[in-house]
Protein backbone atom coordinates (compact mmCIF):
# COMPACT_ATOMS: atom_id res chain seq x y z
CA UNK A 1 0.00 0.00 0.00
CA UNK A 2 1.49 3.34 -0.98
CA UNK A 3 0.65 6.99 -0.32
CA UNK A 4 -0.28 8.81 -3.51
CA UNK A 5 1.36 12.01 -4.76
CA UNK A 6 0.01 15.31 -6.05
CA UNK A 7 0.45 14.06 -9.65
CA UNK A 8 -1.74 11.01 -8.97
CA UNK A 9 -4.37 13.12 -7.17
CA UNK A 10 -4.56 15.57 -10.10
CA UNK A 11 -4.83 12.70 -12.61
CA UNK A 12 -7.58 10.92 -10.64
CA UNK A 13 -9.53 14.15 -10.22
CA UNK A 14 -9.36 14.81 -13.97
CA UNK A 15 -9.95 11.26 -15.26
CA UNK A 16 -12.13 9.72 -12.54
CA UNK A 17 -13.90 12.77 -11.05
CA UNK A 18 -12.51 11.70 -7.67
CA UNK A 19 -12.83 15.22 -6.18
CA UNK A 20 -15.32 17.87 -7.36
CA UNK A 21 -14.82 20.79 -7.30
CA UNK A 22 -11.08 20.25 -7.54
CA UNK A 23 -8.24 22.69 -6.89
CA UNK A 24 -4.98 21.50 -8.56
CA UNK A 25 -2.76 23.81 -6.47
CA UNK A 26 -2.79 25.32 -2.98
CA UNK A 27 -5.05 28.33 -2.37
CA UNK A 28 -3.74 30.48 0.48
CA UNK A 29 -5.44 33.81 -0.18
CA UNK A 30 -8.90 35.05 -1.10
CA UNK A 31 -9.64 38.65 -2.04
CA UNK A 32 -6.15 39.64 -0.88
CA UNK A 33 -6.59 38.13 2.61
CA UNK A 34 -4.83 35.09 4.07
CA UNK A 35 -7.04 32.04 4.56
CA UNK A 36 -6.58 28.53 5.91
CA UNK A 37 -5.19 26.83 2.78
CA UNK A 38 -6.98 24.24 0.68
CA UNK A 39 -6.32 22.25 -2.49
CA UNK A 40 -3.67 19.78 -3.63
CA UNK A 41 -0.59 19.35 -1.44
CA UNK A 42 2.46 17.15 -1.97
CA UNK A 43 0.82 13.93 -0.74
CA UNK A 44 -2.76 14.86 0.01
CA UNK A 45 -5.70 17.13 -0.58
CA UNK A 46 -6.77 19.86 1.85
CA UNK A 47 -10.58 19.90 2.01
CA UNK A 48 -12.89 22.79 2.87
CA UNK A 49 -16.05 22.85 4.94
CA UNK A 50 -19.20 24.32 3.43
CA UNK A 51 -21.35 26.97 5.09
CA UNK A 52 -23.81 24.33 6.39
CA UNK A 53 -23.32 23.54 10.08
CA UNK A 54 -25.13 21.61 12.78
CA UNK A 55 -24.17 23.07 16.15
CA UNK A 56 -24.57 20.81 19.17
CA UNK A 57 -26.75 22.16 21.97
CA UNK A 58 -27.90 20.78 25.28
CA UNK A 59 -31.24 22.62 25.23
CA UNK A 60 -33.11 19.33 25.43
CA UNK A 61 -30.81 17.87 28.13
CA UNK A 62 -30.83 14.44 26.56
CA UNK A 63 -28.30 11.62 26.70
CA UNK A 64 -26.09 11.35 23.63
CA UNK A 65 -26.81 7.87 22.28
CA UNK A 66 -25.38 6.90 18.86
CA UNK A 67 -28.11 4.24 18.46
CA UNK A 68 -30.95 6.68 19.16
CA UNK A 69 -29.49 10.05 18.33
CA UNK A 70 -31.90 12.95 18.89
CA UNK A 71 -31.65 15.35 15.95
CA UNK A 72 -33.09 18.06 18.23
CA UNK A 73 -29.66 18.12 19.87
CA UNK A 74 -28.46 20.27 16.96
CA UNK A 75 -29.24 23.75 15.73
CA UNK A 76 -28.91 24.22 11.96
CA UNK A 77 -26.76 27.14 10.89
CA UNK A 78 -25.87 28.48 7.43
CA UNK A 79 -23.09 31.04 7.71
CA UNK A 80 -19.52 31.92 6.69
CA UNK A 81 -18.40 31.10 10.23
CA UNK A 82 -19.48 28.79 13.01
CA UNK A 83 -18.79 29.63 16.65
CA UNK A 84 -18.52 26.42 18.67
CA UNK A 85 -19.21 26.84 22.40
CA UNK A 86 -16.54 25.73 24.91
CA UNK A 87 -16.18 21.95 25.22
CA UNK A 88 -18.81 21.35 22.53
CA UNK A 89 -18.83 20.32 18.90
CA UNK A 90 -20.35 20.96 15.50
CA UNK A 91 -20.88 19.00 12.31
CA UNK A 92 -20.37 20.33 8.79
CA UNK A 93 -19.90 18.90 5.32
CA UNK A 94 -17.20 19.36 2.75
CA UNK A 95 -17.45 21.65 -0.25
CA UNK A 96 -15.92 18.78 -2.22
CA UNK A 97 -17.78 15.68 -3.41
CA UNK A 98 -15.67 12.49 -3.41
CA UNK A 99 -15.72 9.31 -5.52
CA UNK A 100 -13.21 6.88 -4.07
CA UNK A 101 -11.82 4.19 -6.43
CA UNK A 102 -12.17 0.53 -5.48
CA UNK A 103 -8.44 0.13 -4.82
CA UNK A 104 -8.09 3.25 -2.62
CA UNK A 105 -8.61 4.03 1.07
CA UNK A 106 -8.17 7.48 2.58
CA UNK A 107 -7.31 8.79 6.00
CA UNK A 108 -8.24 12.34 6.94
CA UNK A 109 -6.31 14.42 9.46
CA UNK A 110 -7.11 17.86 10.86
CA UNK A 111 -5.04 20.85 9.79
CA UNK A 112 -2.44 22.09 12.27
CA UNK A 113 -3.86 25.63 12.12
CA UNK A 114 -6.99 24.40 13.89
CA UNK A 115 -5.25 21.80 16.08
CA UNK A 116 -2.94 24.47 17.51
CA UNK A 117 -6.06 26.34 18.64
CA UNK A 118 -7.54 23.31 20.41
CA UNK A 119 -10.00 22.55 17.61
CA UNK A 120 -9.94 18.89 16.63
CA UNK A 121 -11.29 17.77 13.25
CA UNK A 122 -12.41 14.14 13.14
CA UNK A 123 -13.29 12.31 9.94
CA UNK A 124 -13.41 8.56 9.47
CA UNK A 125 -11.68 6.92 6.47
CA UNK A 126 -13.26 7.13 3.01
CA UNK A 127 -13.60 3.48 2.10
CA UNK A 128 -13.19 1.89 -1.35
CA UNK A 129 -16.04 2.96 -3.68
CA UNK A 130 -17.55 5.33 -1.11
CA UNK A 131 -19.13 8.38 -2.72
CA UNK A 132 -20.58 11.59 -1.32
CA UNK A 133 -19.95 14.78 0.62
CA UNK A 134 -17.92 14.16 3.77
CA UNK A 135 -19.47 14.90 7.15
CA UNK A 136 -16.89 16.68 9.30
CA UNK A 137 -16.83 16.69 13.10
CA UNK A 138 -15.27 19.68 14.91
CA UNK A 139 -14.56 19.44 18.65
CA UNK A 140 -13.74 22.56 20.64
CA UNK A 141 -11.50 21.29 23.44
CA UNK A 142 -10.95 24.77 24.90
CA UNK A 143 -12.80 26.62 27.69
CA UNK A 144 -13.50 29.45 25.20
CA UNK A 145 -15.69 29.74 22.08
CA UNK A 146 -13.91 28.64 18.88
CA UNK A 147 -14.42 29.80 15.29
CA UNK A 148 -14.57 27.62 12.15
CA UNK A 149 -14.36 29.29 8.73
CA UNK A 150 -16.54 28.06 5.87
CA UNK A 151 -14.98 27.65 2.41
CA UNK A 152 -11.46 27.41 3.86
CA UNK A 153 -9.22 24.41 4.57
CA UNK A 154 -10.03 22.26 7.60
CA UNK A 155 -8.40 18.86 7.07
CA UNK A 156 -6.10 16.90 4.77
CA UNK A 157 -7.11 13.72 2.96
CA UNK A 158 -4.29 11.22 2.36
CA UNK A 159 -4.85 8.59 -0.33
CA UNK A 160 -3.55 5.02 -0.05
CA UNK A 161 -3.57 2.71 -3.07
CA UNK A 162 -3.87 -0.97 -2.14
CA UNK A 163 -1.50 -3.65 -3.39
CA UNK A 164 -4.57 -5.76 -4.12
CA UNK A 165 -8.17 -4.74 -4.88
CA UNK A 166 -10.58 -5.51 -2.04
CA UNK A 167 -13.08 -8.33 -2.38
CA UNK A 168 -15.98 -6.27 -0.97
CA UNK A 169 -16.17 -2.48 -1.22
CA UNK A 170 -18.28 0.01 0.74
CA UNK A 171 -20.61 0.21 -2.26
CA UNK A 172 -20.91 -3.60 -2.41
CA UNK A 173 -21.88 -3.64 1.30
CA UNK A 174 -24.47 -0.92 0.63
CA UNK A 175 -22.86 1.27 3.30
CA UNK A 176 -25.31 3.47 5.19
CA UNK A 177 -23.45 6.71 4.41
CA UNK A 178 -23.14 6.07 0.65
CA UNK A 179 -24.11 9.07 -1.53
CA UNK A 180 -24.66 11.38 1.47
CA UNK A 181 -25.53 14.88 0.31
CA UNK A 182 -25.62 17.09 3.40
CA UNK A 183 -24.46 17.04 6.99
CA UNK A 184 -25.44 13.50 7.98
CA UNK A 185 -26.32 12.48 11.54
CA UNK A 186 -25.51 9.02 13.00
CA UNK A 187 -27.34 6.06 11.46
CA UNK A 188 -27.71 2.50 12.71
Curated annotation (Swiss-Prot):
InterPro entries given in the database record? dCTP_deaminase (IPR011962), dUTPase-like_sf (IPR036157), dUTPase_trimeric (IPR033704)
Q: Family assignment? A: Belongs to the dCTP deaminase family.
- Protein name in the entry: dCTP deaminase
Pathway linked to the protein: Pyrimidine metabolism; dUMP biosynthesis; dUMP from dCTP (dUTP route): step 1/2
Q: How does it assemble?
A: Homotrimer.
User: A GO BP term, please?
Assistant: dUMP biosynthetic process
Q: Which reaction does it catalyse?
A: dCTP + H2O + H(+) = dUTP + NH4(+)
EC number of this enzyme: 3.5.4.13
Sum up the protein's function in the record's words: Catalyzes the deamination of dCTP to dUTP.
Read off the Gene3D superfamilies from this record.
Answer: 2.70.40.10
GO molecular function terms noted in the UniProt entry = dCTP deaminase activity; nucleotide binding
Sorted alphabetically, which keywords does the UniProt record give?
A: Hydrolase, Nucleotide metabolism, Nucleotide-binding
Active-site residues, as the UniProt record annotates them: 137 (proton donor/acceptor)
Q: Gene encoding it?
A: dcd
Q: What is the lineage of its organism?
A: Bacteria, Pseudomonadati, Pseudomonadota, Betaproteobacteria, Nitrosomonadales
Tell me which domain of life the UniProt entry assigns to the organism this sequence originates from. Answer: Bacteria
User: Quick one: which residues bind dCTP?
Assistant: 111-116, 135-137, 156, 170, 180
| PANTHER family (alphabetical) | DCTP DEAMINASE
Main EC class the enzyme belongs to: hydrolase
Source organism per UniProt: Nitrosomonas eutropha (strain DSM 101675 / C91 / Nm57)
Amino acid sequence: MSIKSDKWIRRMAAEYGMIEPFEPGQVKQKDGHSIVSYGTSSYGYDIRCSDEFKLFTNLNSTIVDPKRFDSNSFVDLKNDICIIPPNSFALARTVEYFRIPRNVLTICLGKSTYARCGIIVNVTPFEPEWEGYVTLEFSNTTPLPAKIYANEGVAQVIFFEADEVCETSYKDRKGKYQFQQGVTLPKI
